[in-house]
Amino acid sequence: MVWQLKERYKFDWNRIFGKDAWHIEYSITDKCNRNCAACSHLAPLSKRPNFVSKEEFEQVTANLNRCLPDIHTFWLTGGEPTLHPEYISLLNIARHLYSEAYIGIYTNGTTLRKFEQDEWFWQFIKDNGIVWGVTIYNGEKRYIEELFDKHDCLNNLAIVRNGSSFTNLTNYSKGQEVSRKKYEKCGWERRKINVRNGKIFNCPTCEFADLFNEYFNESLKVTEQDYLIVNDLLTKEQVEEFKNPMPFCSQCNLDIRYKRL
């Protein structure tokens, strides 16, 4: 079966904030090859790769597909997901489980150079309709556009953002309020399902708090009410009801959210 894209994937944050069907973001590694300020996934703090196994990925994704079959896009993310030694196999698994959805990978694009002459790679991307959501650094937009165009894969390229500036996204601070008003103000994309280590989180701030704790020897608390375990018992209703203020919100301060660094 061929899933070639008939038109270019349109990346729009406004849709993801609340208009699309679900977007699933599955973190397959904590490792990254950049050291970006204010990384929302705290990748610069990671001390180990935390590569998801193919077995766990397939089991978790199958359960997600059972609960949420009608999603918009299934994304691999990290860290830098292309550092996972089996990320192409994971894309293939996701493609066959979510045969009617878009399948994508968020990346900084730095590993694409080694595939410049790899025709099998580009044919796989094209035939499986794999979307590359690329953040552009160091003025490489032209190179990335030309690379995808050269291999007839321009429909598979989505420029996510310009990585030339950074804004504050995470500010851990205990004793904060937990309220519907704060939750609505928070701004994390409400149509996203954040998945890591077999669990669903409402936001990366909670999802990657363990990296902060380990790096700084801190004690942010993630309770059983702050995540859902993805297993055979998970239901669509649980996922939908989960999109509400969580106990972890008491450890997050929004006062400097989105301020430029």
Predicted regions and their residues:
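Conserved alpha-helical substructure of the radical SAM core
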Residues: 2-105, 112-116
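Amphipathic, soluble alpha/beta structural segments
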Residues: 6-11, 153-162, 255
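Generic detection of long, well-ordered alpha-helical segments
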Residues: 54, 84, 141, 242-246
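A generic local structural motif
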Residues: 61-62, 117-121, 235-237
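Flexible, charged surface loops at secondary-structure boundaries
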Residues: 66-69, 125-127, 243
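Conserved AdoMet/S-adenosylmethionine-binding subsite of the radical SAM
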Residues: 83-197, 201-205, 211
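Accessory C-terminal segments flanking Radical SAM cores
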Residues: 171-261
